[in-house]
Amino acid sequence: MNLELNKSTGNLFVNKSEFFFNNEQFISNNIFLKKHLKVNGFDTYGFEVVFFECNFSLNIIFKDGDFVRYFFLTFDEDCYDDTCLKKKLVELSGFVTKEVNIKPKKQDWKSFFELEWGSIELNAIRQDYSITMNIHNV
């Protein structure tokens, strides 16, 4: 499914309809739902989405019916380059980068986005370094 972001509110939309990520009943009954896992009392719901022209798994977590958080996880080849990720977020969304940290790190590559009401935190972890960018609405 194609996911869009309202840059002024941080709300997510699918086909021009708001995607209520903080409502478990809406999430659990959504026709696009791909997976549901329950681990240690936490319910995780997974969706396959296209967001900022990249393929992501959108994961939404609830605890006892209360919204906890959501994040995007990607292994998309088009998102492997941190410059590409930054360009997509900054140029396509109108967000500006406030902070970038790069440090050596020995881990398998993964990247995830956390979105909370107009603020995106990007953590890209590769085999040789990790990048953290805090990106906020202009």
Provide a role label for each language-model segment.
Residues Q107-A124:
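Low-complexity, intrinsically disordered Gly/Pro/Thr-rich segments
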